[in-house]
């Protein structure tokens, strides 16, 4: 056995430890010696002798068969192998150890499997080895079970073949055939692996190659993308939907993309892990960011305005294809001249026309009808006197009107700059031909579903009004012709098909199909297209227009001819012909076109009114106060005037009062008769049933008409004949009535216009202003303090003279025919004295002539403001006719002759002296050198009549102080006209005492204290 004749151990034998080999040697001692000898003899003959090998193999085979028939375990072969492994040298002992490990494992595995037939371990070991796998590893006891499972797996996969399936007689030939099969299997595996690699490369090239990219781009342009490109997996980066402000999506995507580029440039090789940023037009208020982690998105979006980072949503994987699926955009391509609407600002919702588009398609220049107030509502700072412009808001925005350079020049010249006759710059905005040209961002403009109205289209016409509203109305009518609707119960006629000419009743209807019950087919209703039906009406039916220019109009059907229905309009009283399908039956006979109807008085501006002579849905024909007939839109009407509550009146050529509802007749011309509809300034609107033109409405000046019947008498079916005879009116006195007097009536021009007024109602109470306009009972007042216009009831104002004076009410102003009280030039303290007696017994009588002016001078009286005379009972009536500067005497006959106050300058006449040189207005002037109560004597020195008495005893008394008239030794009683010192004498009691306390200029003045 030492000659190396032992069969070499296969490469797949495992190496076992010494403990297992010792156990194997113990098992080998129990084997039969015959087997060991036979095996050892075969080993000594050498491997080179084929005959010996064949004989040994045959002997072994016979022994194995004999042992298998007896049922004894085959352990002799194992013992022989153990002996041979011990005698081997040069590393053969390790190979035998590996064989023992393999035998141990197999035996241990076989002991567990009792159902399997036991075979010689050496032969089974040789046949179950894989010659093409080099499996050599050191294993431990813990990995024995895993090796057993791997071996069984190799057996199942065909890498190890069982010897029991082959004929045992083949021997080495069977092993060679097995080697050939294994080599062929390896070749097949190599070939299949190469084919798999080529096939995989082809698939990758088709999927990610350049040709596939071209196909993908072509498919994307066609709107179709294969589904395999849209299927993500859980390994792909997550996409988060982040909430943002609606309308800011595209702007935020550009902003975030720019931020990413800046961060990548600053960080160098460390790129930010943001893979993509996008938004979808179908999902407003969200942007989508693709990133591997949520924290990356939070840090990336931190500090960016208009992003609500706390409100983010993870998009599920199954919804990603729908999110990334391309859809056809519904955006309208903007072109010059197309109509759009503004989304924000004071022009929100206004129609605009595209004038220019920027090169980057991000901004657009629009042509808009401006909304300006020209600084009417600006406030002025009371300290700096600077104008504070108020920015108009959407709630208080002005009406759309073309730019008026005259108004801007008059009200806000500082902000106006003229470039040429057509181009102006006002508040840094350009106005050309009256239109505003302003740039807007594309996201602030609405481009879809723009349906301009007739009113809006009319504003974009030329300044001369070249827009043909009739043509626009006809185009709208044609567009609405397709909007035909049928209601259940409508009687219709079939126009096309086999049932042409049949008539039936609509059972139900949709936008395109109508179900009709025909008498010829009572069992089953038939369906017809809407275009094949026509409505049926009869004369006398009351119909209403549901589509077209006359939408909302109603009336009675007169005739029907070839599908055209003619009816009498309830609004215009004219015949209207319209297609039958644009009508529907109506039980309401009142016109319902809009809030305006025939003969309504409407306000077009602050000073212009008109009467509607033809009413439509959006277009009206009116006649203004000048008699001009024009066509306007509904938006041009500011408001409707309620004539039933109007108190406006005027007078005819005879001075008779005319009010709304009265009947008048023209004095000259066609002598047209009619009823007054409205009174405006110097014109009146009259409607006549005898005139067909302009719906019977005409405008006439009240000077050219006569009133023939008042409204009140018309209600009582009586004519007011008294107003037709001026002689009777002149003989008739003023009407007597116990009732309170009626409110004053207006005559001629409005008396309140241009008057200075003070507000008496709350809100602006006490503020001064000027009446700029009057419309009915309302007056437009321009306040002085705020440069602001307000509208207020004209009877809640107090009217003043421009120079001051007392205020009066509106009714007093009307009674005075617009004349205001004269303004005071200054305060007056003159009180006319009573007539004084000439003797000691003369008593200054009390004044009972209060109506004549008595004590207080009559400021602003109707007689020109003259000082009234003093009416005395005790001294005659010599002072009754005295005037302020006239020739009447001051004191009559007994007080000093015929001295005048200022008639002859006071040169020669004295107050009470006898030739004295001190006159009232002579050398000693009233206010020249002498003071008011100073050393100036009342008369010449030495006279008894108050010779030494001064006004204030030398003191400068005030107007209402406690100064006495004189300061004599008798107790202070002034002796104006007598020598008696008694207080009870008639001349001693001063008449100033009784009435002096009532003076308006000094309060409790004691001019005449006893």
Curated annotation (Swiss-Prot):
Among InterPro entries, the record links this protein to: KOW, KOW_Spt5_1, KOW_Spt5_2, KOW_Spt5_3, KOW_Spt5_4, KOW_Spt5_5, NGN-domain, NGN-like_dom
GO cellular component terms attached to this protein's record: DSIF complex; rDNA heterochromatin
Q: List the keywords (alphabetical).
A: mRNA processing, Nucleus, Repeat, Transcription
Listed Basic and acidic residues bias regions? 9-26, 55-70, 120-134
Respond yes or no to whether keyword Transcription is given for this record.
yes
Subcellular localization(s) per the UniProt record: Nucleus
Q: What is its main location?
A: nucleus
Q: Where is the KOW domain?
A: 333-360, 536-563, 750-777
Q: What is this protein called?
A: Transcription elongation factor SPT5
- Originating organism: Candida glabrata (strain ATCC 2001 / BCRC 20586 / JCM 3761 / NBRC 0622 / NRRL Y-65 / CBS 138)
């Amino acid at each position: 056995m030492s000659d190396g004749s032992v069969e070499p151990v296969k490469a797949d034998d495992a190496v076992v430890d010494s403990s297992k080999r010792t156990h194997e040697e113990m098992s080998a001692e129990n084997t039969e010696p015959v087997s060991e000898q036979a095996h050892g003899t075969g080993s000594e003959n050498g491997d080179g002798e084929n005959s010996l090998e064949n004989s040994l193999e045959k002997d072994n085979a016979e022994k194995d068969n004999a042992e298998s028939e007896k049922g004894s375990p085959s352990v002799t072969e194992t013992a022989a192998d153990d002996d041979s492994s011990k005698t081997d040298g040069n590393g053969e002992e390790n190979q035998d150890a590996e064989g023992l490990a393999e035998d141990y494992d197999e035996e241990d595995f076989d002991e567990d499997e009792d159902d399997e037939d036991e075979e010689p371990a050496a032969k089974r070991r040789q046949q179950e080895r894989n010659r093409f796998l080099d499996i050599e590893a050191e294993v431990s006891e813990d990995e024995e079970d895993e090796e057993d499972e791997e071996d069984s797996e190799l057996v199942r996969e065909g890498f190890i073949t069982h010897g029991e399936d082959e004929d045992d007689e083949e021997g080495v030939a069977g092993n060679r055939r097995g080697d050939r099969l294994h080599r062929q299997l390896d070749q097949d595996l190599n070939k299949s692996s190469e084919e798999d690699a080529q096939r995989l490369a082809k698939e990758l090239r088709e999927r990610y190659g350049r040709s596939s990219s071209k196909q993908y781009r072509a498919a994307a342009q066609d709107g179709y993308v294969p589904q395999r490109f849209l299927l993500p997996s859980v390994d792909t980066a997550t996409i988060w939907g982040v909430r943002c402000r609606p309308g800011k999506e595209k702007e935020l995507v550009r902003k975030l993309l720019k931020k990413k580029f800046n961060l990548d440039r600053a960080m160098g090789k460390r790129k930010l892990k943001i893979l993509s940023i996008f938004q979808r037009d179908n999902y407003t208020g969200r942007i989508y960011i693709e990133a591997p982690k949520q924290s990356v998105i939070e840090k990336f979006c931190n500090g960016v305005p208009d992003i609500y980072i706390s409100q983010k949503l993870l998009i599920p994987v199954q919804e990603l294809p729908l999110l990334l699926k391309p859809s056809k955009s519904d955006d309208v391509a903007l072109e010059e001249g197309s109509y759009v609407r503004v989304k924000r600002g004071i022009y929100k919702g206004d129609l605009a026309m595209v004038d220019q588009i920027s090169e980057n398609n991000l901004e657009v220049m629009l042509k808009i009808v401006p909304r300006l107030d020209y600084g009417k509502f600006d406030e002025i700072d009371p300290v700096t006197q600077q104008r504070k412009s108020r920015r108009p808001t959407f709630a208080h925005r002005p009406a759309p009107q073309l730019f008026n350079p005259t108004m801007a020049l008059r009200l806000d010249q500082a902000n106006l700059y003229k470039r040429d006759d057509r181009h102006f710059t006002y508040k840094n905005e350009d106005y050309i031909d009256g239109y505003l040209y302003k740039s807007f961002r594309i996201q602030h403009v609405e481009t879809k579903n723009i349906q301009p109205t007739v009113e809006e289209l009319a504003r974009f016409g030329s300044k001369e009004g070249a827009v043909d509203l009739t043509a626009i109305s006809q185009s709208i009518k044609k567009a609405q012709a397709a909007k035909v609707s049928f209601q259940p119960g409508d009687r219709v006629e079939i126009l096309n098909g086999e049932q042409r000419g049949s008539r039936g009743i609509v059972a139900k209807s949709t936008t395109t199909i109508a179900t009709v019950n025909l008498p010829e087919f009572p069992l089953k209703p038939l369906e017809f297209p809407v275009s094949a039906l026509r409505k049926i009406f009869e004369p006398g039916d009351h119909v209403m227009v549901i589509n077209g220019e006359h939408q909302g109009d109603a009336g009675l059907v007169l005739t029907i001819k070839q599908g055209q229905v003619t009816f009498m309009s309830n609004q215009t009283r004219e015949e209207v012909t319209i297609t039958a399908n644009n009508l529907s039956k109506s039980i309401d006979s009142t016109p319902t076109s809009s809030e305006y109807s025939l003969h309504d008085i409407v306000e077009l501006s602050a000073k212009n009114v008109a009467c509607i002579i033809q009413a439509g849905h959006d277009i009206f024909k009116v006649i203004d106060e000048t008699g001009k007939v024009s066509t306007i839109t509904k938006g041009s009407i500011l408001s409707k005037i309620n004539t039933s509550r109007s108190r406006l009146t005027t007078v005819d050529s005879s001075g008779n009062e005319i009010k709304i509802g009265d009947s008048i007749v023209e004095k000259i011309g066609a002598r047209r008769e009619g009823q007054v509809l409205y009174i405006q300034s110097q014109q009146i609107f009259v409607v006549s049933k005898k005139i067909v033109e302009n719906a019977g409405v005409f405008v006439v000046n009240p000077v050219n008409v006569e009133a023939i019947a008042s409204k009140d008498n018309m209600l009582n079916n009586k004519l007011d004949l008294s107003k037709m005879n001026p002689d009777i009116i002149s003989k008739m006195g003023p009407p007597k009535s116990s009732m309170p007097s009626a409110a004053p009536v207006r005559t001629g021009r409005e008396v309140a216009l241009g008057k200075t007024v003070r507000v008496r109602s709350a809100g602006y109470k006490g503020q001064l202003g000027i009446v700029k306009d009057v419309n009915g009972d309302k007056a437009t007042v321009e306040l002085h303090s705020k440069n602001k216009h307000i509208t207020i009831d004209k009877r809640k104002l107090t009217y003043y003279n421009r120079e001051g004076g007392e205020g009066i009410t509106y009714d007093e102003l009307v009674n005075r025919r617009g004349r205001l009280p004269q303004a005071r030039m200054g305060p007056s303290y003159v009180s006319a004295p009573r007539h004084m007696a000439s003797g000691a017994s003369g008593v200054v009588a009390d004044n009972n002539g209060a109506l004549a002016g008595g004590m207080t001078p009559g400021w602003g009286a109707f007689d020109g403001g003259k000082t009234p005379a003093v009416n005395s009972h005790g001294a005659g009536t010599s002072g009754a006719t005295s005037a302020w500067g006239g020739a009447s005497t001051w004191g009559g006959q007994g007080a000093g002759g015929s001295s005048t106050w200022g008639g002859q300058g006071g040169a020669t006449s004295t107050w009470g002296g006898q030739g004295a040189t001190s006159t009232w207005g002579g050398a000693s002037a009233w206010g020249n050198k002498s003071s008011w109560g100073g050393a100036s004597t009342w008369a010449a020195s030495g006279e008894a009549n108050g010779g030494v008495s001064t006004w204030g005893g030398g003191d400068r008394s005030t107007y209402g102080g406690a100064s006495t008239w004189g300061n004599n030794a008798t107790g202070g009683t002034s002796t104006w006209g007598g020598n008696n010192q008694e207080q009870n004498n008639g001349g001693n009691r001063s008449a100033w005492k009784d009435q002096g306390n009532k003076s308006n200029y000094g309060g409790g003045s004691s001019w005449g204290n006893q």
